[in-house]
Amino acid sequence: MRSKRKPIAIAILVVIAWFGVTGFFGPLFGKLTSVQENDNSAFLPDSAESTKAVKLLESFAAGESTAFPTLVLLEGSVGPEVLQQINAHLETVPDLKLGGTDVPLSKYLLPGSRVTAFPAADGKAVLASILLDGAAIAEVLPNDEPVLPAIVEALREDFTPFAKDLGFDSYVTGAGGLIGDLFGAFGDLDSTLLLTTLGVVAFILIIVYRSPILWFLPLLSAVFALSTAGGIIYLLAKNDVIDVNGQSQGILSVLVLGAGTDYALLLISRYREELHHHSTPVAAMRAAYKGTFEPIVASGATVALGLLVLLLSDLSGNRGLGPIGAIGVAVAVITMVTLLPAFLVLFGRWIFWPRIPRFDDVDAQLTGTWAKVGNLVERRPRRAWIITGLLLVVLAGFSTTLKTDGLSSSESFTGNPESVVGQKLLLNHFPGGEGDPTKVILKNELIPAVSEKLRGVEGVTAVAPEANAAGVIVKDGLSILNVTLSTAPDSRESRDRIPAIRDAVKSVDESILVGGTTAVFFDTDVAARHDNRTVIPVVLLLITLILGLLLRSIVSAVLLLGTVVLSYFATLGVCALVFNHIFGFAGADASFPLFAFIFLVALGIDYNIFLMTRVREESGKMGTRKGVIKGLMVTGSVITSAGIVLAATFGVLGILPLVFLAELGFAVAFGVLLDTIIVRSILVPALVHEIGPKVWWPSKLSKSAD
């Protein structure tokens, strides 16, 4: 009797321990937004020229800070009297209160700066440049809300009625407006994204299990995992160990809930199968645990290690996602191999009601749809892998048309927030770079020579040294040239001019630095392309080693990796067609191929690990060719369900008004479905059946009779 009670007692202790852990970390997860860093310049390595420029620019500003321009565009007929009214109103801007607090906007203005307006040459618009303190706006308000979106909201609430009274339209735009709207989009992560993801997962689990009760246990376990991982990440970010931005927080939520639910599905499926062969839930769980622990841990390790390779990235945002995702996946694995088994053992067989698996019942997994698929592959394996392989190759051919040369801030939104509309209207009245010029830091005596060189660069509309009432500002023998471009500072056209600007100034003096918003965007694209070249080969090597060790076979490791990489390029091909011709996106971020690769290859390998570990187990009993068909039959339903869950969770990213996350969500959702329905269900089993026992070379299994 005591031996029977011991597993139950252990299960109770595990559940109590998890409630304690989540009770501590859960509330901290709610604060994760307050430690986000969404400024592009903060993501660049110290070696980037624009980063060096930022550090030098800080020494020019009073209070050791950098100017962060926020623009207010007022459209209407401008006369002397109206301009006077606008300037008078601008004097009240420093007194605006932020985010429902008593904190005035003046606290975040660049010391010594004045808020003034100047009219457009066409007399149809006025532009006010509000210079914010770049260091101060990185703080949070007393209510833990980020400062910048609160400033943007306060300016809009103030200027909208004022402009209306004048018969004008107002738009808060520029770097401050665009990033403020970016923060606003990420602000939905805590509520809209999380609740939608939970709802989607719950809906799919109810359909999969056809039980009014069972779905709750894996979902609750996944929520415990997310809360715990989020709390750990908050503590690390608060202590400056890792960088968190809105994208990485959103990806964390869908990754933990999606991957965690996948692992839960695998365990529950095997547990249900074993309940047909064991008289007690404890005995069934022991057998299920033995059969699923290795593939779950191996799958989690593959994803986590693949994400950790992002630590090799130049971009700190990518480096931050590495440990963030790895922590999330690791906690998800730990939760699903500890908390979920404890829940299942405590609730017993009845948790599967109304489809309760009975001892000695026939397991339905060996009949039905997946038995038919298995029989089809078994009858004509060569035709199966040739047709599916050719389909993937054709789709992969379109991957060369995917545009990954980066997005401007205005192209980064799926809709048209006020900052994007304002940025477009700004170009009708002012040079695109007005209010946010490219910064050239140089020795004071070189100003005439460098200015002459810059005026000869295509797209440069104005060159002027930074000055105050006393004249040109000089700090330690250095000055700043403000270079105004004809196009928006974050546009591809402006970015493409940075090399020419740098070549022009360095022809005078190699020590001259070019910085500012446009240079930051250009250097970010360069760093992203470096990350693509560096990280992807390392991930491929790492995954090959993990597969080889897990399956004890070089042939199967290379085979699986090859099919998943082919699936990745096929997905990129479909993305190119959809993004260009259906969604109408301007392109994709330079980091998109890397993010898509990390998730598609690492998560795609997951399903092949689930399949092939079971195939190896069955091959030892009945031979490779029969074993692969049996493995496909018994894992088909659960792996497809897992793929649907993961696709749905990443697809939820599409509800956010951000092009990068919408594109990533589509890519992962489509790629995972392609992998589960085509690659893992037909291509891999057909190839294994064709190759036979040699697929396990050099292990002993390769020499067994088939």
Predicted segments with their positions:
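Membrane-embedded transmembrane helical bundles of large multi-pass transporters/channels
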Residues: 1-37, 135, 140-404, 509, ...
